[in-house]
Amino acid sequence: MAETTVETPVEGTEGEETFAEVTTFESEVPVEGEYTSESLAGRFGDPQPAAGLGRRKNAIARVRIVPGTGKWKINGRTLEDYFPNKVHQQEVNEPFKVLELDGRYDVIARISGGGVSGQAGALRLGVARSLNEADVDNNRATLKKAGFLSRDDRAVERKKAGLKKARKAPQYSKR
């Protein structure tokens, strides 16, 4: 590693430029051409921690993945407690299944807003984005091909004045 010397001025001495002891420390950033097995540890093959944000309808999911055993914590609850419906559990797990990374990461998520389906969609997007961030070179193409990195921007259309719903008009009587 590269050694760097730093001189720091001593406080309280006015007018004089007095410097404290010279401190030498080793930089943690490897200098070009100085890569070792320790500096590359965790870059290839090992799971990396990452974070991602997902949105769907009115739901927002903030997701962190850390190397682990496949545990889920969503707003302090397990996946089965938060999403009792198996369809939603499968939807949220899809990015891991496509990348064949089941059980290699623990997921910690905070979800707010929207309903159950929107929250599941937001969580899936957040998980996919965090997996993409963890290893862009290996994961991005697979996740993109499966459509997991695209935000589904469909939302409820607003109700218009003079109509009963967004598009439903009141019954028309000719006579």
UniProtKB/Swiss-Prot annotation:
SUPFAM superfamilies: Ribosomal protein S5 domain 2-like. GO terms for biological process: translation. One of its GO terms (molecular function) is RNA binding. InterPro entries: Ribosomal_Su5_D2-typ_SF, Ribosomal_uS9, Ribosomal_uS9_bac/plastid, Ribosomal_uS9_CS, Ribsml_uS5_D2-typ_fold_subgr. Keywords: Ribonucleoprotein, Ribosomal protein. The keyword Transcription regulation does not apply. GO terms for cellular component: cytoplasm; small ribosomal subunit. The keyword Ribonucleoprotein applies. PANTHER family: RIBOSOMAL PROTEIN S9 (PTHR21569), SMALL RIBOSOMAL SUBUNIT PROTEIN US9M (PTHR21569:SF1). Belongs to the universal ribosomal protein uS9 family. This is Small ribosomal subunit protein uS9. The gene is rpsI.
